[in-house]
A protein has these predicted regions:
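Local sequence-structure signature of Cys/Sec-based thiol-disulfide redox active-site neighborhoods
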Residues: 1-27
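Hydrophobic beta-strand anchors of alpha/beta hydrolase catalytic cores
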Residues: 5-6, 31, 55
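Short alpha-helical
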Residues: 14, 38-39, 71-74
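Chalcogenol-based redox active-site neighborhoods
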Residues: 21, 46-47
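Domain-level signature for proteins that mediate thiol-based redox and metal-cofactor handling
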Residues: 29-35, 48, 73-74
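Structural microenvironment flanking redox-active thiols in thiol-disulfide oxidoreductases
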Residues: 36-44
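Structural micro-motif
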Residues: 47-58
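Non-catalytic, surface beta->alpha helical segment in thiol-disulfide oxidoreductase systems
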Residues: 56-84
Length: 84
């Protein structure tokens, strides 16, 4: 079960802004937004963040799925349903 989504993005990134609007429609899941320009480089390396936007889906502390790019609400909902 997905308990949290981490979104890695940047203020200058157009697709990241689009994804932010999509994430506003996701309910009942914690969403943490991380600006790659403001976080330590070692975190980005640890999480293997090379492009933005990236969504990482978690079940507790375990990463269970990841997307890259401005994915649709349908894609996000399909991932959530897949892990119910």
């Amino acid at each position: 079960m997905i308990t949290k989504i981490e979104k890695y993005g940047a203020t200058w990134c157009g697709p990241c802004k689009t994804l932010d609007k999509t994430l506003e429609k996701v309910k009942n899941i914690e969403i943490e937004k991380i600006d790659v320009d403001e976080c330590p480089g070692d975190l980005l390396q640890e999480k293997s963040i090379r492009n933005v936007p990236v969504l990482i889906f978690y079940d507790g502390v375990l990463e269970i799925e990841r997307t890259v790019g401005a994915v649709s609400l349908e894609t996000i909902n399909n991932i959530i349903e897949k892990w119910k």
